[in-house]
Swiss-Prot record:
Changing R739S: No effect on RNA-binding. Changing H611 to S/Q: Reduced RNA-binding. This is Protein Smaug. The SAM domain mediates the association with the 3'-UTR of specific mRNAs. SUPFAM superfamilies: ARM repeat (SSF48371), SAM/Pointed domain (SSF47769).
Amino acid sequence: MKYATGTDNAMTSGISGQTNNSNSASNEMQPTTSTPTAAHKEATSTATTTATYANGNPNSNANPSQSQPSNALFCEQVTTVTNLFEKWNDCERTVVMYALLKRLRYPSLKFLQYSIDSNLTQNLGTSQTNLSSVVIDINANNPVYLQNLLNAYKTFQPCDLLDAMSSSSSDKDSMPCYGSDFQITTSAQCDERKLYARKEDILHEVLNMLPLLKPGNEEAKLIYLTLIPVAVKDTMQQIVPTELVQQIFSYLLIHPAITSEDRRSLNIWLRHLEDHIQAAAAGLTNRSYFLQPSPQLVAGGSSTGSGSCSSSATSSSTASCSSVASSSLCPASGSRSSRTNDWQTIAPPSKQLQNKLAGDWRGNGGGSSSGSINPLCDNLNGITLNELASSQNSLGLSLEGSSSLVNGVVAGAGSMLGIAGGDDHDTSFSKNGTEILDFDPVTADMGEACSLASSSLCGRNGGNPVEDRSQPPPNLQQQLLQPPPYASILMGNVGDQFGEINRWSLDSKIAALKTRRSNSLTTQTISSCSSSSNSSVITVNDNCSNSTENLAQFANKPRSFSLSIEHQRGALMNSGSDTRLDEFKPNYIKFHTRNVGMSGIGLWLKSLRLHKYIELFKNMTYEEMLLITEDFLQSVGVTKGASHKLALCIDKLKERANILNRVEQELLSGQMELSTAVEELTNIVLTPMKPLESPGPPEENIGLRFLKVIDIVTNTLQQDPYAVQDDETLGVLMWILDRSIHNEAFMNHASQLKDLKFKLSKMKISMVPKMHHVKPAGVGPNNGNINKPRWNGKTRKCDTKNGSNDRINNRKNSNDMLNFSLNCLPHPLPHHSQQAPPPLPQFDYNGYGGGPSHQPQYKSSSYPSFMGNPQQQPPPPPSSKSHHHPQQMQQMLQQHNHFPALPQQTPPQSHRRSLNNLILVAGGPQQPQQLIFKPGQGVLTNNGSNDNLVLERNQQSQQQQQQRKLSGGVSSAEQQPKKTMAAVVMENLAKFDQHFTLF
């Protein structure tokens, strides 16, 4: 709790002339115990002493006598802060307490939650104004009441204001009625409600009710937001005080009910308000915005952060300022037009086109003042003007006039939120489910000091806060030039994006925070984290507690690639499970700065694995960054290795112009390959660069040279037919274009880069993909041929069914063993090279028996396949399956002793398109045919002699008689079907003899 000293006296003297703010909205919102009692003072003093002894002096245990000076120092600081706190109004106190709460750890937050609950219970039980507090709470969330209040504000014209200020009581009865602080609005009670004579009273009531808005009440929130455009216009017409609108902005920007899209839309109107305040402070309220501002403002546009630089993102925004000026010259017409300007005119970009934002504010603009307004100033992540003033003041620069009195309390709330105008503001670096916004809150310290001073000025003016608005007191300027030491403690830039309901409601439990893996033992501490709808948001903060009890810690220190930002191309092309994949996500580090060319410093440091030193560059300009030396880095506490690496990388930044010039010349002359040029672009795209339009010599314009090289590379890829179109090179080039689109230097050329990226993506899609998994030659049954394999003589199917390795002859009848005459039956056949198989118990028409099916080989399509699955074949006749017994078949083999001995392993030859595996055709086409049944095959003789037929019949009869003798007990009923089947088959074959064709 020991704070830095050295400028305490400056702050004390700066605010010595300030008094308590007396223009608060209503006294019922003030706590009843605002003045500490004696008991409270004693308890605070005891707690202060205890805290000082515990944490005030790190070396307190070494020397007990040193605790007294530390105790006195802390007590003085607490007294100073308390005195300042009492001088602030309710809105300032709320913003300060909100900022302090976000710096506490979880146990401290729970303690404060219990204390707040207890205090609320006691105050509601003992306070005399508890009824009014409850009524205000109800009205703040009642859409009907708020709508009536808004309608009354819109219908109250400036002419009505003048009439109301001079009207009698009878005239007031005819005025429209709207809500009060003490009762709920109903149509029957309109006459009993308090009558507001001015719009200021309505804004005071809104200011009282806005903090009581409950998250989730979308209807009430929409009414509050609808009031903002009308109130800003009235402020510019000097109808209502500026300080009231600023305080309303402050509540809205930190309210948990306001989403990120609503806050982004509020930023548009906030910038218009900043423009008006800056112009009023410079004495330009009644002048056209197209006129040249004073020389002080022109000088401050680039060095001290003038209002025109803060609010002019594009020429259309500048033109809108002209419209604002013209409306301020015609108050009546401007107020009448504000009736139709509701919240839909500032809808988020996702709901409405950007060129239609702000309604009639952009209707009269046709040009821009390029001499006084830098269109690039507002493109650097949309930082408010007050943050620019703070960064320049921290560098010791002076501010002209009262240009620091820009935002009031709004600067404190807006800088805490890190408001951005672009659509990519919510994009943050995500790693392991944790969003990280890497920037330091100290950049907004001066902004909060300005807001405190502005609000104190409002308090001193009392009932007339508009007067002396353009001329601040001299002591206040000195106070702004010397920010207090506790400014960084009270009003840190916490930078969260408060998006959803109950973000930091103390009535609900703090959401569980996600932790992330760390590869380093040295980590930075962070501020307390707020829960989000998607993930936790972590904000780097050097001023927070150094306790190890923080639930999440930022910034590991992983391994370093090299001394430059050269990356492996494979890491840019391929995907995997490495946690470095999302490090190249654009805008993952929200480094908010107004220094031109430095917004991308966080991305560059992250690529170097040196992002923990991002705080060194928060207030540096681009030129100062290039002048950093290794000795300077070591003098500010950077380690030796990191300082050496960073110094080498900064030296390489100075060589970028020469490298790009060399690459351009070699590409034009054809001496460099495209892949080498793309590699050089990869090393430069993440480095900080000034915008192309920045003043300076052309040889130092890195962005312009970078775009020239990209143009040469892309034209070569698209037009040169001899260029090597590599898929990998195209992918890396598209990655470079994606990074360039989000780079500050090419922000005005983003559309051209997107078109170029689209063309390259189409080219990449049209490229022939690489053939993967190519089978080498000579491998596999097809010898590496990826086409359909064809049948040939070398790969003819073998009869593996019956265990034979001999190939089946598919072109002729291969049954040589069965081609014999019955004349030679009594004698062995000497020319047989193949012999019949042993008898099988079961067999079918295809000769495969009951064995497993064979997968058909690739065969010529001109022949049908008979080798399919057995399920697809017709069932065999029952005579061939059920009436052959093993004993009978053995006797038949013994009787036909003219057959040679058959080995067990020799299978019969089969033809895939004939029936020769079942029968052997005997005799010519004119001879009758008959079947001779054998165990496993039938034979048709091929002899023209009638003796063969007679001999065959005698042989059949002898065979049947022998079977009867051997069977013995077999009945004639069992044998009769076999004779009948044989006779039927012979008769049928004899009749259809002429239809058989021998092959």
